[in-house]
Amino acid sequence: VQIKKRTGRLHPITKFEKETVALFEKLGFQRFDAPHIDSDYNNFEALNIPSNHPARDLWDTLYIDSQKYGIEPGKLLLRTHTSNSQIRIMKKFKPPTRLMIIDRCFRYENLDARHEHTFEKFEIVYIDKNLSMGNLQYLSEYFLKNIFGEEIKVRLKPKYYPFVEPGAGVDGECIFCKGKTEKQIGRKLRV
């Protein structure tokens, strides 16, 4: 009796992550990692999100019982975004800088079909002279067209974010219904 050899497959998130990293490596970006457990300072304060800033109301933070480790309560947490890498990058590297962060983030969420306490986030830190919103638009289109196909329609639009200025949102038209459905869910992809 011959036993059929088992073969494994990459998890879809892992596969997507590898594709994304390869795309941005072609443009000269390098991967950068930051810790999952971090200080309140790196996660909020260093990003101009002080304790009373309205941006902190946009997510619920998972704080760690830091007194066990001799750290002031409320000062140690599971990062809520990959942006905790930004202060480290700016301290460690001189411009021009092309780095990407793709990793897990954690938020205290009411779990449902669209919300989970752990999720993956991708972000780039691109610091150089003469960069503009045009560069952001190009990188957004480059990413979406390479992942979802050249036919995807992409739109960059100004958007208010309390922690960054200027801010922009990127919409990608649904590749299945081509934006024809009346339902909001599944019609657009937010980047």
Protein language model regions, located:
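TRNA-recognition modules of translation machinery and tRNA-sensing kinases, especially anticodon-binding
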Residues: Q2-V191
